[in-house]
Amino acid sequence: MVQLKTAALALLFAGQAISSPVDIDSRQASVSIDAKFKAHGKKYLGTIGDQYTLTKNSKNPAIIKADFGQLTPENSMKWDATEPNRGQFSFSGSDYLVNFAQSNGKLIRGHTLVWHSQLPGWVSSITDKNTLISVLKNHITTVMTRYKGKIYAWDVLNEIFNEDGSLRNSVFYNVIGEDYVRIAFETARSVDPNAKLYINDYNLDSAGYSKVNGMVSHVKKWLAAGIPIDGIGSQTHLGAGAGANVAGALNALAGAGTTEIAITELDIAGASSTDYVNVVKACLNQSKCVGITVWGVADPDSWRSSSSPLLFDSNYNPKAAYNAIANAL
């Protein structure tokens, strides 16, 4: 085991941002924020990856191995990646992610089976109900079967709500109707009964917001109808200062009646220590919140990189927010 120098330890867990380079390999001998988070009874504190970000340099995978306990594929399990043409599946990218995660002892969240975006044109152009139902079932069955027993949780449905809490007019809703929700979850349950099945969305960050209310009321209705929804995922893409609202939002989502909830795509504009600690504590204090996934490792790889929203800077050094989380756990 690589010995971690006392100076490096002091830098890593100090409450200030680290400005000098850190030996990434040495950091693997330290206690990870995932390990500290799990010591409080949670399942994981994770991040995202795909073949490109896992192979572009040595620092990104080293940080994932050292500090995070779970991986979500950023793009490689989305419909346009896995079934670009009807019945023709491609799993090279998702296989790489799953193999990396398993070989390094990381939990995996499958993301995502049904989403209106990054959807191939051949799917969005379907107008026949029975055809779309068949396509939907086949896609879910094929993707989930390949990874059966390897995925902790699946985002079965992603971003199906409008901001007013009503259901989005996607091809699935427009052609099949609301029943596509039941079809998707029942199909997923039949394929892998042991995987946790989630409905995932963004802007679920303030209690009382119409989208939160819509999610809660719909999930309550669907659960009462026997639809097998295990969890609600709150993406939690936040603006600066919004971390304080997350605790109330999680409590509201927990009231929907699922067995668990999770923060699934966390990033925060400006990455302030206060915001990040507020979010981590919100999950710690809500018994149904099983884990947090940060939507990226270092700022250059973020989908909103100009906002510097992640825990590591452009040199892959941990920021003040990382150290604040470590100190808070």
From Swiss-Prot:
Q: Spell out where the chain is glycosylated.
A: 285
Q: EC number(s) in its UniProt entry?
A: 3.2.1.8
Field pH dependence? Optimum pH is 7.0.
Q: What class of enzyme is it?
A: hydrolase
Thermal dependence of activity in this record? Optimum temperature is 60 degrees Celsius.
Keyword Magnesium in the entry? The reply is no
Q: Which residues form the active site?
A: 159 (proton donor), 265 (nucleophile)
Stated family: Belongs to the glycosyl hydrolase 10 (cellulase F) family.
Q: Which UniProt keywords apply?
A: Carbohydrate metabolism, Disulfide bond, Glycoprotein, Glycosidase, Hydrolase, Polysaccharide degradation, Secreted, Signal, Xylan degradation
Q: What does this protein do?
A: Endo-1,4-beta-xylanase involved in the hydrolysis of xylan, a major structural heterogeneous polysaccharide found in plant biomass representing the second most abundant polysaccharide in the biosphere, after cellulose.
Where along the sequence do coiled-coil regions lie? none
Output the Gene Ontology terms for molecular function. Answer: endo-1,4-beta-xylanase activity
**Signal peptide positions on this chain:** 1-19
Name the chain's protein.
Answer: Endo-1,4-beta-xylanase A
